[in-house]
Amino acid sequence: MTSAMKKIQPEAFSEKSSDSQASVSGAKSSSFYIGMRVLPPAEREAMYAIYNFCRQVDDIADDLEGSQEERKQALDAWRHDINALYAGEPCGQAAFLKEPVARFHLRQEDFIAVIDGMAMDLKGPIVFPDEATLDLYCDRVASAVGRLSVYVFGMDPNIGESLAYHLGRALQLTNILRDIDEDAEIGRCYLPREPLEKAGIPLDIEKALADPRLDKVCRDLAWQAEGHYAASDHIIHNRPKGYLIAPRLMAAAYSALLRKMLAQGWKNPRKKVKHNKLALLWTLLRLKVTS
């Protein structure tokens, strides 16, 4: 489990056959797809391009059939092409980002941060990171994507970056809590080390996931995510300038998912919670009426 943006769309969509769309896949019924559809064309295409980039580098990190060196080289190639793009040089696979970068003044360091986040997964399965490492990971694979997005949404940079900070972490923590068992199957566990040790839970994936004390650790992490959702809601409810339906929908959809998990708990055996598609559409209609 890596980028929040990738996790937000599990199925396939395709708007057209342009380079920026060629490898994009997502869900026509997902919160990402629904949220992006309400944007004006230029903003929508820019978001699809950002997603395309995220999807490609995320797939490199998740390609468990490729060797570590092959995947490292692939991420290094992306890093080279992003740097070339901003230097005005031939930029290879990053060429589809030229227009959104120029139009919306997207920052080089945010693209690089996403790549660096994928590289964290590449160094070996992330297992029980310390809290500082987990926060850095969330910043790179989720909040950095948010920082790119808020420029497309036309938000004030300071307000937008604050929204990206909180909403990115909220979404990523929600994904981590949702995908505990799925991640464990590939030898990963993103739950932070310190609360597990404090609870006396062994730092062994199989033992930790079967431990009844895990429920409280997960609930505490869920409340951290709730705090980030609350901070995001506070920013959005102040009605800053920009196209806010997309982040509002993401926040509404994923905070609802988190509430479902809190109601269900994390005691073994766990049942993975999913989005309610009709509820997503209803939320979109409600947000359009109140925007």
Swiss-Prot record:
InterPro entries: Isoprenoid_synthase_dom_sf (IPR008949), SQ_synth_HpnD-like (IPR017828), Squ/phyt_synthse (IPR002060), Squalene/phytoene_synthase_CS (IPR019845), Trans_IPPS_bact-type (IPR044843), Trans_IPPS_HH (IPR033904). SUPFAM superfamilies: Terpenoid synthases (SSF48576). It is an enzyme of class 2 (transferase). Pathway: Secondary metabolite biosynthesis; hopanoid biosynthesis. GO terms for molecular function: geranylgeranyl diphosphate synthase activity; squalene synthase [NAD(P)H] activity. Pfam families: SQS_PSY. Keywords: Transferase. It catalyses: 2 (2E,6E)-farnesyl diphosphate = presqualene diphosphate + diphosphate. Belongs to the phytoene/squalene synthase family. HpnD subfamily. Involved in the biosynthesis of the hopanoid precursor squalene (SQ) from farnesyl diphosphate (FPP). Catalyzes the first step, the formation of presqualene diphosphate (PSPP) from two molecules of FPP. This is Presqualene diphosphate synthase. The lineage of its organism: Bacteria, Pseudomonadati, Pseudomonadota, Alphaproteobacteria, Sphingomonadales.
